[in-house]
Curated annotation (Swiss-Prot):
Chain ranges of the Glutamine amidotransferase type-1 domain: 9-202
Name recorded for this polypeptide: GMP synthase [glutamine-hydrolyzing]
Keywords in alphabetical order: ATP-binding, Glutamine amidotransferase, GMP biosynthesis, Ligase, Nucleotide-binding, Purine biosynthesis
Binding site residues for ATP: S230, G231, G232, V233, D234, S235, S236
Family matches, as InterPro entries: Class_I_gatase-like, GATASE, GMP_synth_C, GMP_synth_GATase, GMP_synthase, GMPS_ATP_PPase_dom, NAD/GMP_synthase, Rossmann-like_a/b/a_fold
Native source organism of the sequence: Rhizobium etli (strain ATCC 51251 / DSM 11541 / JCM 21823 / NBRC 15573 / CFN 42)
Pathway listed: Purine metabolism; GMP biosynthesis; GMP from XMP (L-Gln route): step 1/1
């Protein structure tokens, strides 16, 4: 997160909504830089960023409860345009003298908005007398407006669904314009940013690249940087950006834990050495990792072993180089946004995340994180800007622990080889069918289950392979991909015929939630 003022930016105050990041994505899509700050530190964030407009997010809290969160008064004293969404609308009204009460008719899901009056946010989009679909999710509702506000649109259960004080440039909506279920929502946010706040929208990956390179050079000076290269998009883009800034002062280390997809480590090493002239060390630590993982079935234990061994191996290799002053990481913006809690309790850990963990503290290095202001889609755009091929940028996400968490139960080299071959065939069939780019993530899972089969004249007793494919926008929610049955038949037949050790293939039709994308 940037530590200084950012010209032509938007500040998003987060009250704990599950979709606050979508607001930021819509602002970025409009070509404008923005930052999310939790309400507890919003005043500090406002002073630091010096934005040109403010958006107040939704929240699971109720504005009528004692101690419920509020926007800092400095926002309303600043004279800047403010857009309140759902809870953001309610707290804005309460803080400016209006009234809110718990609704007797809660409104969740699709609703229709009737436009009563024209307003600046509707320019080129909506007109008086028109009706539009929106997405509601609220219990409380505004019952009396502050001075200066007027109602510009209503719904059947929300008489103050869209309000405006055009003199002060304050706008509030009871629905969620940031979600895709509000078809014109992104355009409404764009109108607020461009038409009301007067922000041009010239923030681009080219401009970000130039700024990031300058900041890396200033931070690193003539010191050395090491970077853990996994072969994923995030670490690869971070490495290329750091290399552009400091050249041979960067050394990348690829720790091959033996849990990658077929030929993946070799292909990554070849690409970076041949096309980008990076100083890259390829460390084959597969015996070390698989030796400790063999027989381990608990997924959390697997992740912790992999994380510990990664740190130990990386640390050993870095010391052989004589150490470094900086550690480069592909940390993204969603990783650094502070979570908002109303209870003070910790969030539930669904899965431990595998990354470089405690390396900076252990090795007394400072972090270089050139992607920490970007979302995943922006990292891909930056990768294209840096010259990475689309075939690499568009690869499906791959977990840090690799095939270890796609092999439930105990791990052996034999199982990993069986899984690696099945996965390669599955992905090959997806590419042949022209489906790869339509799917967010696809992979094979080797189940710790054996079943009876018949091949030729003999009886078999071999493993079951599960195929998984999902569609998603950001990985937060996902639906299983609806394949044609002929495709599944082709993929299953090839896997059974070509992979020794598998005699049955099944397809996973679980969405997220209730399931997760990965099996472990």
């Amino acid at each position: 997160m940037t530590q200084t003022a950012h010209p032509d930016s938007v500040l998003i105050v987060d009250f704990g909504s599950q979709v606050t990041q979508l607001i930021a994505r819509r602002v970025r899509e409009a070509g404008v830089y923005c930052e999310i700050v939790p309400f507890q530190s919003a005043e500090e964030g406002f002073k630091r960023l010096q934005p040109k407009a403010v958006i107040l997010s939704g929240s699971p809290a109720s504005t009528v409860d004692e101690g419920s969160p509020r926007a800092p008064q400095i926002i309303f004293d600043s004279g800047l345009p403010v857009f309140g969404i759902c809870y953001g609308q309610q707290t804005m009204c309460m803080q400016l003298g209006g009234k809110v009460e718990s609704g007797h008719h809660r409104e969740f899901g699709r609703a229709f908005l009737d436009v009563d009056k024209d307003c600046e946010l509707f320019e080129g989009l909506w007109s008086s007398g028109s009706r539009h679909q929106v997405w509601m999710s609220h219990g409380d509702r505004v019952t009396a407006l502050p001075d200066g506000f007027k109602v510009v649109a209503t719904s059947s259960n929300a008489p103050f669904a869209f309000i405006a004080d055009e003199k002060r440039k304050y706008y509030g909506v009871q629905f969620h314009p940031e979600v895709v279920h509000t078809p014109d929502g992104a355009k409404l946010i764009g109108n607020f940013i461009h038409n009301v706040a007067g922000i041009k929208g010239d923030w681009s990956m080219s401009a970000y690249r130039q700024k990031a390179v300058e900041e890396i050079r200033k931070q690193v000076g003539d010191k050395r940087v090491i970077c853990a290269l996994s072969g994923g998009v995030d670490s690869s883009v971070a490495a290329l950006l750091i290399h552009e800034a400091v050249g041979d002062q960067l050394t990348c280390i690829l720790v091959d834990h033996g849990l990658m997809r077929k030929d993946e480590a070799a292909n990554v090493v070849a690409m970076f050495r041949e096309h980008y002239n990076l100083h890259l060390l390829h460390v084959d630590a597969s015996d070390r990792f698989i030796g400790e993982l063999e027989g381990v079935s608990d997924p959390e234990t697997k992740r912790k072993i992999i994380g510990r061994l990664f740190i130990e191996t990386f640390e050993e290799e870095a010391k052989k180089l004589g150490g470094a002053d900086f550690l480069g990481q592909g940390t993204l913006y969603p990783d650094v946004i502070e979570s908002v809690s109303f209870t003070g309790g910790p969030s539930v850990t669904i899965k431990s995340h595998h990354n470089v963990g405690g390396l900076p503290e252990r090795m007394k290095m400072q972090l270089v994180e050139p992607l920490r202001e970007l979302f995943k889609d922006e990292v891909r755009a930056l990768g294209r800007e840096l010259g990475l091929p689309d075939s690499f940028i568009g690869r499906h996400p791959f977990p840090g622990p690799g095939l270890a968490i796609r092999c439930p139960g105990g791990i052996t080299r034999e199982k990993l080889e069986i899984l690696r071959e099945a996965d390669a065939i599955y992905l090959d069939e997806i590419r042949k069918a022209g489906l790869y780019d339509a799917i967010w993530q696809a992979f094979a899972v080797l189940l710790p289950v054996q079943t009876v089969g018949v091949m030729g004249d003999g009886r078999t007793y071999e493993f079951v392979c599960a195929l998984r494919a999902v569609t998603s926008v950001d990985g937060m929610t996902a639906d299983f991909y609806h394949y044609d049955m002929e495709f599944l038949g082709r993929a299953a037949t090839r896997i059974i015929n070509e992979v020794r050790g598998i005699n049955r293939v099944v397809y996973d039709v679980t969405s997220k939630p209730p399931g997760t994308i990965e099996w472990e």
